[in-house]
Amino acid sequence: MKHKVSKRVISLKWVPFLCISFFALGAIFTSRSWEPSSDSGSQLISQHHRDHELQIVSDDCAHNKKATQEKDVTGEVLRTHEAIQDDRSLDKSVSTLSSTRSSQEMVDGSETNPRKKVFMVMGINTAFSSRKRRDSVRETWMPQGEKLERLEQEKGIVIKFMIGHSATSNSILDRAIDSEDAQHKDFLRLEHVEGYHELSAKTKIFFSTAVAKWDAEFYIKVDDDVHVNLGMLASTLARHRSKPRVYIGCMKSGPVLAQNLLNCFRTVKYHEPEYWKFGEDGNKYFRHATGQIYAISKDLANYISINQPILHKYANEDVSLGSWFIGLEVEHIDDRNFCCGTPPDCRWKAEAGDVCVASFEWSCSGICKSVERMKIVHEVCSEGEGAVWNTLL
């Protein structure tokens, strides 16, 4: 019993000590327990600072990126503006070059010899071998010398034999033409190599050359084996001068000749190598003026001059000319006085008061044996020498 009491007393003595010990241990434990929390708080604060700094850096990057983009856009605008300025400079340069070229052309002759305004320019198609044909024309319906000059000055009618040059520079053929021109002063020299199969090219070059030299209301092409009444031609054209685009002549539409050989010894004169472009065999050409003589107004001559490099040439010159006007607003005028026959046809018409513009024979595509017969045709079919001078233009 005594033993039990003693044991209880010892226990009571140790209670305060144990309490203090537990309190101390609790304090120590509590202090250690909050240290990590303090570290966590510091980490949270540090993390917050880092996030804030990252946000600032990010904002700075975004700002810099935006600034860079704005700078890039500004740069693009500046470069575009500079490019536009360059384009304007280029346009200005082209304009300057054009002006310089125009000025040079004026210096070369346009200023001192500007295009003369005339009523009509007639080009008589001729060849090196056709001296006698030219003389037969000069002796009949074409005025010579002072009369030819006066016709141009008073009536605005220009008449020239048109011819190119030979394949060999300064050949005997070219020198012969030089000599003939020095005598008669009635040639228009073309930058063209003469050849029968190059008539389409020659026609283009004639119109281009004539347009560059004369500002005419009408341009006419005629062959050197055709008889022409100049007064009737001028008065006929004058009736159409108010129309902007006219194509005047004897309109026809012949068959497209696909075969090149008649037999083993003869070829077809008017064979068309590009016959397939006109459709099936047996088709006809589109309507066009026969090539012996035709007239076109100023706008059409200018059109040929401007587009000369890209105008297609067919085998036949008159077909080529007609093809150049396909698709254009052109008035085709079929005037049968442009294709009268030789006597007695032209005489009958003259007696009836319907003087012919031109006379020739279809079988020869001109006046047959024109060198010998031009005078005969002129005596019978001529309108009279004074007709052209009395024509009101």
Swiss-Prot record:
Top-level taxon of the source organism: Eukaryota
One Pfam family recorded for the sequence: DUF4094
Transmembrane segments: 9-29
Tissues expressing the protein: Expressed in leaves, stems, flowers and siliques.
Biological processes, Gene Ontology terms: protein glycosylation
Biased composition (Low complexity): 93-103
InterPro entries linked to this entry: DUF4094, Glyco_trans_31
Location of the region described as Disordered in the Swiss-Prot/TrEMBL record: 89-112
Entry EC no(s): 2.4.1.-
Keyword list, A-Z: Glycosyltransferase, Golgi apparatus, Manganese, Membrane, Signal-anchor, Transferase, Transmembrane, Transmembrane helix
PANTHER family per record: BETA-1,3-GALACTOSYLTRANSFERASE 7, BETA-1,3-N-ACETYLGLUCOSAMINYLTRANSFERASE
Protein name, entry field: Beta-1,3-galactosyltransferase 7
UniProt source species: Arabidopsis thaliana
